[in-house]
């Protein structure tokens, strides 16, 4: 069965919008305990916005929350956590609650040059003692990014970026990294 989505967007000028969206999905799995196929529903809600505070300042952000939508969240998309084992029910799976959001601010120095900064968080929540046997599994990630972009032409953009990221596992073991991109 495909994922079903719906969205509605309100624009109040060329650079400003508010968008609401939803997704419902079904995930099927086979149980080795009863040799039957079972399914779990996943669902999520999203809200996003972008608007000008002044002609040079723009605010933007997005929030996503749901169960079984890890493939749609940046840090969670490669972890295969849309549907996971339920340690309390042998042979059964479950969907976990997850949250992702970011908020940022952009300043347009000129028509072709801008700087921006963004903070983001992705989080996977535990249910039914999962992941009881994987304490080093990803629980939460955060990043803070600052960048500078120059639109050289309509088809060429160059930029530089600094990113600081933090990761916390279910064992509460924190890690961090710094990165420069150009």
Name the predicted role of every residue range:
Residues 144-161:
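C-terminal closing repeat unit and adjoining cap/tail of repeat-based domains
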Residues 39-40, 174-178:
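Short, conserved loop/turn and helix-capping segments at secondary-structure boundaries
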Residues 11-138:
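Detector for outer-membrane/organellar transmembrane beta-barrel domains
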Residues 128, 168-170:
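A short, acidic/glycine-rich surface segment
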Residues 2-6, 43-47, 99-103, 142-146, ...:
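Hydrophobic, lipid-facing positions within transmembrane beta-strands of outer-membrane proteins
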Residues 51, 150-152, 176-182:
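Outer-membrane beta-barrel "beta-signal"
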Residues 138, 170-174:
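Solvent-exposed loop/turn segments connecting transmembrane beta-strands
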Residues 163-166:
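A short, acidic, flexible beta-alpha connecting loop/helix-capping segment that sits on the rim
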């Amino acid at each position: 069965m495909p994922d079903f989505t719906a969205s509605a967007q309100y624009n109040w000028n060329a650079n400003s919008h508010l968008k609401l969206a939803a997704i419902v999905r079904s995930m099927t799995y086979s149980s080795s305990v009863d040799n039957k196929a079972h399914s779990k529903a996943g669902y999520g809600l999203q809200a996003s916005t972008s608007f000008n505070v002044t002609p040079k300042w723009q605010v933007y952000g997005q929030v996503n929350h749901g169960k079984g939508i890890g493939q749609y969240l940046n840090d969670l998309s490669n972890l295969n956590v849309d549907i996971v084992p339920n340690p309390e029910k042998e042979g059964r799976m479950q969907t976990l609650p997850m949250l992702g959001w970011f908020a940022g601010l952009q300043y347009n120095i000129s028509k072709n040059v801008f700087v921006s900064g963004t903070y983001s968080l992705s989080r996977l929540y535990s249910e039914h003692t999962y992941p009881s046997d994987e304490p080093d599994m990803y629980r939460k990630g955060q990043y803070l990014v600052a960048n500078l972009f120059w639109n050289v032409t309509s088809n060429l953009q160059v930029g530089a970026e600094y990113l600081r990221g933090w990761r916390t596992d279910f064992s509460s073991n924190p890690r961090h990294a710094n990165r420069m991109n150009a």
